[in-house]
Amino acid sequence: MGAYSLSDLSADVQRLVDVHDDIRKRTRAIEPYLRRWMDAPDLTDAQRAPCDGRACGHLLHTAADGSFFIISVVFPPGTSSGVHYHGAWGVIGVLAGVDEETKYSRAEGPAEPGAGESCELAQTAKLHFPPGSVTYLLPPEQGYHRVRAVGEEAGVSLHILGGTPETHPHLLCHPESRTLVDFPMAALLDQVPPGT
C-alpha cells in the first residue's frame, strides 16, 4: 500500500462532507485524515513557496460539487494575514514554521457579517501552532482571526475550506476604516497545479 496522498485525502474529505452536515462534527471527522496526510505530505517545492516573497495560497484541489477546496498557504517569516473573517468551515494543519493565531469575537456576539459592517473586535485568544498542529474555523463564533509566521522559518500549512475559492466567504478587517471589505480567496491564490 502506497503513501496516503493528497488525492486520498481529497476523497476522504468528500465522503465526510457528504455524511456530516454539522460543521463541528465534520471538522473533527476530517482531522485524523489530515493528520495521516501530514505524516508524509506530498507537496512540491513550489507548493511550499511564497509568491514573490509575499504570503499566498496554492490551489491543490477543488471538489467537483463545490463543497470544499484545499490549498497550501505560505507565510514568509514575520508576515501576517491581517485580521479577517472566514464565513465557512475549515480545518488547518501546520506543516512547517510556527503559526501564531490570534482569535477575535464581535462585541455584539456571533453573527454572519457582511461587507461594510464594523469590525470592532475583542481579542479572545493568542495561540501558537508548531508543525503537526491542527486547528479549525467554525463560523460565525470562531470565524475571525489573524495568522502570523513567527520565528525564522516560513509558515506552511494545509487548509481544507468549505466552498470554492470563488464562493468561500472571506472578509478583511480594513485597518484604517475598521470596516469589513470583501477579500475573495481566489485573489490570494497563485494557482500552482498539483504535481508541478
For the regions a language model picked out, list residue spans one by one.
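N-terminal leader/capping segments at the start of a protein or of a new domain
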Residues: M1-P41
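A short glycine-rich, His/Asp/Glu-containing loop-to-beta-strand
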Residues: C51-P77
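Conserved short histidine dyad/triad with adjacent acidic residue
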Residues: I71-Y85, P139-Q142
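Short beta-strand His + acidic residue motifs that chelate non-heme Fe in jelly-roll/DSBH
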Residues: G82-H84, E101-T102, L127, L137, ...
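Glycine- and acidic-residue-biased ligand/ion/polar-headgroup-sensing regions
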Residues: H86-S105
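A short hydrophobic beta-strand segment most commonly corresponding to one strand
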Residues: V91-G93, E152-T167
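Short acidic-glycine-tyrosine-enriched beta hairpin
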Residues: R106-Y144, D182, A186
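Long hydrophobic alpha-helical segments typical of transmembrane helices together
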Residues: C173-T196
